[in-house]
Amino acid sequence: MFGITSRPYHRWSSFAQALRILQSGTTLALELDHSSLFFSKRNITSCCHHTKPASHTPTSSNSIWTPSPLAESRLRSGYSLKPAHTNRVVTRRYASTTPKDSQPDPQAKTVSKRPAKKMEQWRLQKEALKKKFQEGWAPPKRLSPDAIEGVRELHQQNPQKFSTAVLAEHFKMSPEAIRRILKSKWRPSEKEMEKRRERWERRETRIWDHMSELGLRPLRKRPSSPASDKSSDAETRNRQPLHSIASTLLIQRDISPMWVLLLR
């Protein structure tokens, strides 16, 4: 019997060969490495046949041990049974379960947070408008010259019924704006009135032609002599009173003139 210290074997070709070594009476220990599995031979009880005296007769078949074919082949090939390292200590290395990135960085504590990104100019102005106009953007309303004349006519006929507050609520304006309209004494001249009429006529013609192209209104007949028709229209308009002219223009602009119904 030979007492043999641990000697690492080469990688086994198959697991079946390792099982046969275990069945033959060889004690093996399984050791793990980073790359692969290795078997180390801890203790070989015997590598050859037992030499028994002739007078001894075996009582059972288990008393005689025969080496496995693998052990015989290794002995025939001159496999050295001397230990390579007598004082070798096997240390197991385990990989770290926590990644390096998750470990706390001492320098990270000293670094402060990034400063807030500077807002753009249009965003700052938008926030300022939201704070200033909480109900939304409501620019001051501007009345047309004809609507201004209608406000004056209504207030002149019945100041108690058509007061400043009533007119401001109807025209969706501030009472101060209505008060300034009533206080103002400016009136357009005849030349300015004529330019205004021509502008409204061109606008009416442009809108009518556009609606007729869409099929919403019938085609408009072109006048044979525009100069004569223009002069006749100007004469008829000059004969009409101011409130009727204003009512006609307001109806064309799809405005509900409250004061037109009262003046009729």
UniProtKB/Swiss-Prot annotation:
Polar residues: compositionally biased ranges: 94-105
Function: Required for respiratory activity and maintenance and expression of the mitochondrial genome.
Gene that this polypeptide is encoded by: RRG9
Organism of derivation: Coccidioides posadasii (strain C735) (Valley fever fungus)
Protein name: Required for respiratory growth protein 9, mitochondrial
GO cellular component, one term: nucleus
InterPro entries the record matches: NGRN/Rrg9 (IPR010487)
Entry keyword Disulfide bond: no
Subcellular location(s) per record: Mitochondrion
Keywords from the UniProt entry: Mitochondrion, Transit peptide
Keyword Cell cycle: no
Pfam family, one: Neugrin
Highest taxon of the lineage: Eukaryota
Transmembrane region(s): none
Transit peptide boundaries: 1-12
Stretch list, region Disordered: 86-117, 218-240
Annotated family: Belongs to the RRG9 family.
